[in-house]
Amino acid sequence: MRQAVVIIHGIGEQRPMQTLRAFVAGVLGEGESDLKKRIFSKPDRISDTLELRRLSVRELSDETDFYELYWQHLMQGTTSRPVLEWALYLLFHPCKLNRRLRRVWWGVVAIMAAVAIALTVAFLVWGPSLAIGLTITVPALWIGPRFLKWLAAGQVERLVVGFAGDAFRYLNPDPPNVQVRRAIRTAGLTLLRGLHEDELRRYERIILVGHSLGSVIAYDLITWFWQEQHDRVKLDLESGERKTVVTRHVESSPGADEDPSPLKKLDVPSSDDPSSVEKFRKSQQVLWLDNQKRLPWLITDLVTLGSPLSHADVLLADGIEKLEVGKDQREFPTCPPKGEDCRDRGLLCRKYVGADNEAHKVRILHHGAPFAITRWTNLYFPADIIGGPVSHLFGPGIKDVPLGSCCARSWRSHVQYWKHKCACQELRKALFRPSEA
């Protein structure tokens, strides 16, 4: 089997191939200097940046080609002012934050309060001599900050713009950011179309891997690409021996002529029951395998690392209520998919009215159901304030994998997902398992 793995990098001043080479080195469990013994660097004929290569590994899953969706060059022209305004807005509107981010907010408030208390105590204790000291220190206080500002302005600007600026521009659909968001998504869709429309049909499956902000981009790409393809995804419901939870969702449609059969409780995955999650994931793969020859959809897996989607109620919507509305209206795909009717029966089929004004039932997956056949695995470090579990927001069919045995308390854990052994072991499980698993 030959598969393609697409890596989507996160925030920061990334350079082309920087994330891809480090990721492949971590997954293979070797230093980058040893990679030349096991991989082939080949031209990337799909991306148009002229800066990228694809790394081909022959030992794993027969053959795996690693691609990088590089988007940093599209994120230019960011200034620090709107980024700081966004940060201040969140600081002074804690009600907009979820529970995990509110802990960070309380930490910032505690630091600011401690500084204010320390200055007050200093004034009360040393007040009498403070007047004399002010005569000397005021000029220094006037000159010093200007010197420090001149010295550090470049670094502060780089820190704010180069890191937080990426997240601000992609996650906020303000008018100045719309073109940037569109350019990044267009580049990703072009890559996915190229992999699917390859004349040689080299790949049997495609896996998307997104780190940090790259996981949000990967989620968006699956959403938009599925909307292009879903009308061509027609289900085969005749294979009686391989009925799955997904096909039973279709067959229990209240729109069917016969009385709808109720869904069994075991058909619905539960985050409290890992076996039910694994059963659902198996059914996703069975459905894909049963329809593989006719499916125009090769993306079998989404793997997210340190994903800010764990804060989707803050970053993608204005609170949990609006996120729920978006999911119910299938603007935000979930796993399992939301049904098409208000009775929450998991309806995945649709009726069309043709030119003859006759209703024709077509068994297809609706435009918000990519995770009927695409599995979602989410890896996170418990200490990572950016990443975290996502199944509580996007559905119990997602496999959340906490990486608690290493790097569990490090504040730098967000950038350690392919640098620690336990994380790389989970990555290998997600990327190189058999297609039937």
Positions of PLM-derived features:
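Canonical alpha-helical transmembrane segments of integral membrane proteins
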Residues: R103-F123
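Lipolytic serine-hydrolase domain surface
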Residues: G10-E13, Q18-R21, A25, G29, ...
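Low-complexity, intrinsically disordered/propeptide-like segments
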Residues: R53-L55, T137, L266
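Active-site catalytic motif of lipid deacylating hydrolases and related acyltransferases
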Residues: E13, L60-V108, P128-R202, H414
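Serine-dependent carboxylesterase/thioesterase catalytic core
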Residues: R2-S41, L171-L348, W376
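Short, flexible coil/linker elements and helix-boundary hinge sites characteristic
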Residues: G29, W126-G127, I143-G144, G154, ...
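Acidic/proline-rich low-complexity IDRs
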Residues: T49, A118, S129, P262-K265
